[in-house]
Amino acid sequence: MPEVLNPILESDPKMQPVVPAQRPGQIYRRILVATDFTAASTPALKQALKLAKQNHAELLIAHSSTEPASLSFMSADSYDAWEKQCRTEAEQKIGALIQQARKEGVKAHMLELSGLADDAIVEAAEQLGVDLIVLGTHGRRGFSRFLLGSVASQVVARARCPVLTVRSS
């Protein structure tokens, strides 16, 4: 801990350091990479796989299904069919990614998330003891980013572990 903080922290036992704890050499043991199966997430998947391989880390490949905007107009049967189709497609795509990771000697698992992506990613990372979150980003700025929101910026702001954002081309 920096020497400057010691007198401050010692004067009030309720105060906590704002400097995140660092591990020697910062070796990652559990890496979570989130994908939405778009081109923006491909470079993040590649980088996460590379880091997992280098660190002999476990790779958690996560996907969060988002509900369709027309949800209020769907019948219960239509919603159930849509949800089942989305889950099946995600399982197939993540299954292929897991096979690729295992071919490269990386222990990989699927992590199915539900709810808003940023909330689900942060919560899963905390519950599972993730050392690093890797996210793809589209690189939009200004008004475009404001309109669309940014899962990556929300995760960066709220995660308790390091977050690596990988910009797509």
Where on the chain are the PLM-derived regions?
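Short glycine/serine/threonine/alanine-rich loop segments
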Residues: 51, 57-58, 106, 130, ...
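Small/aliphatic-rich secondary-structure junction motif
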Residues: 2, 20-77
